[in-house]
């Protein structure tokens, strides 16, 4: 089971780990049963990629390229009509390639299997839960290495083994011992290049410049594969990176194991003080990972000359000749985590109406890495703290609670090392009042609650012992002495991180107010409003440090930021047993959260206030404001100069808005000062979900929708032709861009050009899109018969969004990240128990 804690009173006992909320995961335990419950599940799954950006075919690509080459400023050689028509006709694929790189490398569906066996049982003295699971899956890549003559199959092949063992023993009437032993083992095999980079590579390469490979011969006596390529690219020895060759010429293996042991002791101390209990926890976690990589270089070729009439051609090598022997390398990593916790709990009811609870907690955690590379990594990383809680409830109606946490961190100097974080909460359960008796059949429960508290965060994001200085003894500062050939340069020390003994805790003040309502014993509604002010946020100093201090290149960390976050959470839960055959339930959640930057490391005065992020949300975009596309030369001439963006604009280029300085003056020049923060943040401000569950006789059906709103996507890295790599052409660009024949100033893409058009590649509102979406996240139908359950389920089945270029859940960028997966599961579950 999963539960999430967010307010300060709920997270106080977790110390620094609870600064940004806590997720509690509880695994199953045993139970006092006459007979054990045995459960077996077998499942298969089909996986596919949800939405892949559609690329233009070879003919469309070349015609678009020639359109860009026709600009007056272009010196590029356009594709010949013979090549275009030969490609259209599907002639010799080595002279007229039309490669769909995505189809070459990726398949439509992949398959996964999963099996799980668990047993649960026990008696009053001992209970147990044991689970064994195995999962095997392959990826959506095609198996190509054997096709090209390699002895290995480097397609993704992943096997996971999971073991859970929980044992509880009632050693004495007052002593309970619990032991949990969990293991997770993962064996991974796949290509040397990451799946994400391979996917991006299929998008980045155009379909027409070279085939996947050439047949053997053509003047070269070699048994190696003659991979297709084009000279002049960024590959280290000349040419480009052939996506298929990059995929098949290597593989790597990874073995990861995570072993966790938890030992708990619960001792009733009622023989000394009634209601007093001691709880102890010892937890040890070991993580180990080993990697082996085997990879070879490859030789690539391009067409040197060709005879269109006969179809004959000659080849030449791109770059230097490379050896193709497989080279092997490996590495090992791991870490160990130790956690100790001791608590004293007191619970007692006085006079039948006064409930008093108290707890005192001590915890300590230690982290060690198995890969010691420097002084810091050789030292154990430790945190420790104490916490306490006192709560009182009168007759189940009036409730009050007070907490404190006192935590220490190695990231701060001795004077700031420990922080004190108190919190309080009150509640009023109106429905337990006597005057509520007549209302209770309708309003079953009504509770008002509120809390205030402080939380502390020590995660600076800058490594360990952040307050200490870090000096590079071989840095760039130094001096040169001697003359002529006797000149010698000596390097000197430099600060890479400046010391700050005043660095302290990042502190969040949290206020929560909520209401819990239940109607007719079946409809539950929870509404909670929250506000958090986070101060002393860790930031590195930038433009506020003058150069004359001599700290150029050194990072200076300090408590510089302040932010406010307000919002609300709403949840609905409805459960109704309509009759003996029909059960209905519905769940819905809604969260709204809006943050505002109050302070950060910025100059106290700016000539252009629009460049300040203060008053805006974290994750908003600093963008040029577009006015659409320039319709003609006259408009360009009559508007502010945009040459400072690195390109002289022409009709069809993006037209930007000039912004004034703090005096309201316009400089009639478009440059970096003409940007401001616009749009919604990258992280959505609204997240919601809803879905029903229905059980009718032996059938069950459920589905769940999940959506986000008030979020923006900024498109970037999508521009064809003018990049350093052979950029592919997205179909939506080919379908809707500005042309001299169709001068649509509202086109989705400006005019095509082969140059690096700095005017059109600026981050601007022209590329800003609404990132909202609603997804059918899960759906399942099942049938149960005498302990057997058959089911069919799916994940990421449907997506509704105004943004349709790629899966909006992937966020900003070019859509070249590995997409989310659609999964169809089909399985069987059988349970044997004591019924």
Functional labels for PLM-detected ranges:
Residues 587, 597, 674, 684-697, ...:
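Conserved SET/PR-domain catalytic core that frames the SAM/AdoMet-binding pocket
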Residues 73-79, 239-245, 308, 708-789, ...:
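Extracytoplasmic gating/loop element in the C-terminal half of outer-membrane beta-barrel translocons
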Residues 95-102, 372, 671-674, 761:
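Short Pro/Gly-enriched beta-strand edge/turn motifs at strand-loop
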Residues 39-92, 193-198, 464, 575-682:
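Conserved small-residue
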Residues 136-138, 408-410, 576, 682-684, ...:
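A generic structural motif
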Residues 1-3, 9-256, 264-266, 459-480, ...:
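Membrane-proximal, glycine/serine-rich, low-complexity loop/turn segments characteristic
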Residues 109, 166-175, 180-185, 211-212, ...:
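Extracellular/periplasmic, surface-exposed regions of secreted and cell-surface proteins
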């Amino acid at each position: 089971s999963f539960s999430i804690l967010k307010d300060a009173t709920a997270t106080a006992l977790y110390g620094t780990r609870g600064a940004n909320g806590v997720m509690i995961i509880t695994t199953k335990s045993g139970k006092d049963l006459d007979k054990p419950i045995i459960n077996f599940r077998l499942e298969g799954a089909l996986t596919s990629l949800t939405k892949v950006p559609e690329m233009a075919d070879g003919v469309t690509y070349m015609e678009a390229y020639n359109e860009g080459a026709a600009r007056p400023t272009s010196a590029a050689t356009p594709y010949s009509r013979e090549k275009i028509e030969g490609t259209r006709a599907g002639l010799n694929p080595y002279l007229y390639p039309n490669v769909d790189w995505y189809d070459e490398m990726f398949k439509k569906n992949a398959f996964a299997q999963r099996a799980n066996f668990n047993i649960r049982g026990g008696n009053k003295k001992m209970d147990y839960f044991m689970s064994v699971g195995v999962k095997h899956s392959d990826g959506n890549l095609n198996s190509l290495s054997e096709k090209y003559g390699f002895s290995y199959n480097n397609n993704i092949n992943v096997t996971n083994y999971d073991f859970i063992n929980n044992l509880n023993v009632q050693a004495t009437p007052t002593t309970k011992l619990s032991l949990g032993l969990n293991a997770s083992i993962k064996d991974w095999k796949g290509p040397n290049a990451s799946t994400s980079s391979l996917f991006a590579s299929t998008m980045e390469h155009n379909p027409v410049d070279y085939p996947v490979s050439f047949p053997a011969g053509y003047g070269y006596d070699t048994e190696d594969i003659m991979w297709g390529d084009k000279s002049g690219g960024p590959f280290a020895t000349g040419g480009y990176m052939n996506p298929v060759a990059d995929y098949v010429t290597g593989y790597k293996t990874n073995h990861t194991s995570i072993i966790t042991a938890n030992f708990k002791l619960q001792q009733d101390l009622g023989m000394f003080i009634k209601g007093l209990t001691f709880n102890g926890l010892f937890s040890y976690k070991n993580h180990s990972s080993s990697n082996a990589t085997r990879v070879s270089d490859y030789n690539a070729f391009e067409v040197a000359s060709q005879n269109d009439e006969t179809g004959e051609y000659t080849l030449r090598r791109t770059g230097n000749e490379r050896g193709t022997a497989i080279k092997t390398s490996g590495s090992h990593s791991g870490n160990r985590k130790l956690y100790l916790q001791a608590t004293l709990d007191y619970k007692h009811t006085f006079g039948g109406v006064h409930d008093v609870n108290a707890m005192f907690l001590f915890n300590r955690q230690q982290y060690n890495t198995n890969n010691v590379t420097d002084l810091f990594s050789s030292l154990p990383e430790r945190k420790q703290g104490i916490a306490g809680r006192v709560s009182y409830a009168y007759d189940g109606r009036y409730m009050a609670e007070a907490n404190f946490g006192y935590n220490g961190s190695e990231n701060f100097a001795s004077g700031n090392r420990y922080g004190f974080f108190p919190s309080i909460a009150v509640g009023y359960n109106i429905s337990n009042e006597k005057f509520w008796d007549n209302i209770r059949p309708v309003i079953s429960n009504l509770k008002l609650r509120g809390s205030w508290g402080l939380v502390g965060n020590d995660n600076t994001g800058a490594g360990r012992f952040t307050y200490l200085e870090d000096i590079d003894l071989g840095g760039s500062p130094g001096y040169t002495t001697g003359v002529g050939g006797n000149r010698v340069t000596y390097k000197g020390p430099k600060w890479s991180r400046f010391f700050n003994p005043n660095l302290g805790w990042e502190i969040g003040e949290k206020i929560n107010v909520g209401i819990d309502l239940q109607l007719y014993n079946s409809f539950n509604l929870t509404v909670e409003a929250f506000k958090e002010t986070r101060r002393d946020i860790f930031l590195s100093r930038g433009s506020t440090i003058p150069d004359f201090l001599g700290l150029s290149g050194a990072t200076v960390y300090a408590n510089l930021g302040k932010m406010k976050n307000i919002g609300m959470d709403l949840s609905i839960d409805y459960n109704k047993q309509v009759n003996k055959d029909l059960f209905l339930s519905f769940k819905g959640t809604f969260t709204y959260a809006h943050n505002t930057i109050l302070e950060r490391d910025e100059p106290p005065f700016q000539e252009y206030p629009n460049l300040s992020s203060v008053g805006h949300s974290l994750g908003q975009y600093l963008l040029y404001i577009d006015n659409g596309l320039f319709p003609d030369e006259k408009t360009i001439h009559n508007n502010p100069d945009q040459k400072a963006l690195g390109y002289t604009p022409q009709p069809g280029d993006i037209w930007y808005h000039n912004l004034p300085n703090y005096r309201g003056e316009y400089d009639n020049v478009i440059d970096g000062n003409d940007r401001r923060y616009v749009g919604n943040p990258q992280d959505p401000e609204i997240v919601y979900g809803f879905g029903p569950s229905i059980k009718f006789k032996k059938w069950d059906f459920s589905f769940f929708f999940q959506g986000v709103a008030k979020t923006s996507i900024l498109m970037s890295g999508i521009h064809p032709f003018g990049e350093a790599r052979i950029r592919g052409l997205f179909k939506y660009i080919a379908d809707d861009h500005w042309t001299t024949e169709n001068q649509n100033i509202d086109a989705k893409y400006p005019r095509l050009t082969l140059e690096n058009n700095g005017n059109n590649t600026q981050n601007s509102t022209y590329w800003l899109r609404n990132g909202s979406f609603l997804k059918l996240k899960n759906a399942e139908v099942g049938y149960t018969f005498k302990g057997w359950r058959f089911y069919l389920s799916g994940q990421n089945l449907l997506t509704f969004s105004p943004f349709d270029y790629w899966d909006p859940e992937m966020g900003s960028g070019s859509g070249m990240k590995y997409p989310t997966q659609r999964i169809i599961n089909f399985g069987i579950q059988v349970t044997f128990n004591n019924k």
